[in-house]
Amino acid sequence: EIPFKIFLDQWVIKNYRYPQEAVEKKIEGRVIVALRIDKKGILSIKEIIGRNPLLEEEACRIFDGFPQLSPALQRGKPVNILYNYPIVFRITE
């Protein structure tokens, strides 16, 4: 089984697209996506913190269709977890 952080990174890299309007307007920034993985391993977005709606919308879209995971375990029992995931949007020439 792939560790959670590595799986998450791979998912984001695979699904990341810089919004065209943000490129045209030269908008860059960082967005924090507050994720919750419940006891069944289902991911949901609790909050998105950023300074630009275009980047926030893209950060949310990245997680569309995210597959069900194995839940986190504490003392052998499934538990809910919260995880803050930063996404940096930087235009490269």
Where are the predicted features?
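Residue-level recognition of short loop/turn positions
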Residues: 38-40, 75
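Short proline/glycine- and basic residue-enriched helix-capping loop/turn segments at helix->loop/beta transitions
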Residues: 1-33, 55, 60-93
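Generic short beta-strand
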Residues: 34-35, 46
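Hydrophobic "anchor" residues
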Residues: 42-43, 78
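Short glycine/proline-centered loop/turn elements that form peptide/ligand docking sites
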Residues: 43, 47-56
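Short, charged/polar surface micro-motifs in flexible loops or helix N-caps
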Residues: 40-42, 93
